[in-house]
Amino acid sequence: MKVQTKWFGEIEVSEDKIITFDKGIIGFEDWKKYTLVYDAEKEENISIIWLQAIDEPTLALPVMKPEFVFETYDPVVEDELLKALGDDIQDDNIRVYCALTVPRDITKMTINLKAPIIVDFDTMKGIQLIADNSEYQVRYPIYDILKKEEN
């Protein structure tokens, strides 16, 4: 299917690449269907990926795998909440992403470690949860970390 986006123009998205968030994403509860937009050739090494809403061209959230900035990232969430992803969750099918905030001054870029976005690529269901870990911040500064990784 063709999806109109503000930032990437018209993109082709196969049905099996659509992630459904039954409850939406925090702050964007009305939009339930998304896809990940990234350079497929650099998938393993790319730090920033875009979570693009299927039905809203202007809604594209920058996200990244938290391990890029926090190697030991291990959010504590209630197992009961994970059931929204499906009955038979396999660790191999799960990917965790965290939303970024990129202000005009990119040196103030932050990652939200407190509310991970969890996707089961077997069921293509996603959920955003609040981690119980007190050490995880909503606005964890990452500019210096990304700059160091770039060099």
Swiss-Prot record:
One GO CC term, this protein: cytoplasm
InterPro entries noted in UniProt: Flagellar_assembly_factor_FliW, Flagellar_assmbl_FliW_dom_sf
One matching Pfam family: FliW
Keywords for this protein: Bacterial flagellum biogenesis, Chaperone, Cytoplasm, Translation regulation
Domain of life per record: Bacteria
Compartments reported by the entry: Cytoplasm
GO BP, one annotated term: regulation of translation
Job description of the protein: Acts as an anti-CsrA protein, binds CsrA and prevents it from repressing translation of its target genes, one of which is flagellin. Binds to flagellin and participates in the assembly of the flagellum.
Subunit structure: Interacts with translational regulator CsrA and flagellin(s).
Entry similarity comment: Belongs to the FliW family.
Protein name: Flagellar assembly factor FliW
Species assigned in the record: Lachnospira eligens (strain ATCC 27750 / DSM 3376 / VPI C15-48 / C15-B4) (Eubacterium eligens)
